[in-house]
């Protein structure tokens, strides 16, 4: 995991299960996975990661995506500069994350790891709008999570 990482973690809501060190570790795994998937020239990443509640999650989703509900993860990709450093912000709505984990019969930590990896990959330019892009991104997420000992998040529980 050689890619340099500057990660700013902000807590709009606190959750003792999601300390900075754990979030940082998940982001580092995602960066390592991306480096092995064609992002070898990535010199580093400067990312913000904010954990929010329902009201803030809903406001941000409405303001930036025109959708009036809180979503699980929002990513703002700012691109990779000439210095090879990718920049972006990731917002995880903790109540949505917790609800989805229960509904999907996953542990909160496994689902939080998945959403953190997913958001990090978006910050690096991955997307899932087109079918081919979605397959590539989901395969990479699955591989990264497997390295962490987490089951394929796309298999039905």
From Swiss-Prot:
SUPFAM superfamilies in the cross-refs: Metalloproteases ('zincins'), catalytic domain
Details of cofactor binding: Binds 1 zinc ion.
Subcellular location: Cytoplasm
Keywords: Cytoplasm, Endonuclease, Hydrolase, Metal-binding, Nuclease, Ribosome biogenesis, rRNA processing, Zinc
Binding annotation for Zn(2+): 118, 122, 128
GO molecular function: metalloendopeptidase activity; RNA endonuclease activity; zinc ion binding
InterPro entries, per the entry: MetalPrtase_cat_dom_sf_prd, YbeY, YbeY_CS
Any one Gene Ontology BP term: rRNA processing
Kinase among keywords: no
Needed co-factor(s): Zn(2+)
Pfam families in the cross-refs: YbeY
Top-rank lineage group of the source organism: Bacteria
GO CC list: cytoplasm
EC number: 3.1.-.-
Gene3D superfamilies reported for this sequence: Metalloproteases ('zincins'), catalytic domain (3.40.390.30)
Disulfide bonds: none
Record NCBIfam families: rRNA maturation RNase YbeY (TIGR00043)
Family note: Belongs to the endoribonuclease YbeY family.
Function: Single strand-specific metallo-endoribonuclease involved in late-stage 70S ribosome quality control and in maturation of the 3' terminus of the 16S rRNA.
Protein name per the record: Endoribonuclease YbeY
Organism in which the protein naturally occurs: Bordetella pertussis (strain Tohama I / ATCC BAA-589 / NCTC 13251)
Gene: ybeY
């Amino acid at each position: 995991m050689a890619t340099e990482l500057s990660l700013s973690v902000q807590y709009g809501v606190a959750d003792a299960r999601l300390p900075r060190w754990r979030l940082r570790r998940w982001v580092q795994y995602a960066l390592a996975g991306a480096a092995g998937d064609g992002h070898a020239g990535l010199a580093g990443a400067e990312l913000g990661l904010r954990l929010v509640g329902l009201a803030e999650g809903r406001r941000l989703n409405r303001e930036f995506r025109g959708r009036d509900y809180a979503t699980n993860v929002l990513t703002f990709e700012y691109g990779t500069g000439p210095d090879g450093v990718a920049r972006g912000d990731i917002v995880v709505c903790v109540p949505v994350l917790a609800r989805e984990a229960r509904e999907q019969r996953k542990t909160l930590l496994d689902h939080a790891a998945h959403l953190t990896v997913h958001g990090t990959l978006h910050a690096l330019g991955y997307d899932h709008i087109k079918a081919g892009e979605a397959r590539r991104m989901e395969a990479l997420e699955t591989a990264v999570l497997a390295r962490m000992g987490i089951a394929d998040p796309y298999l039905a529980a």
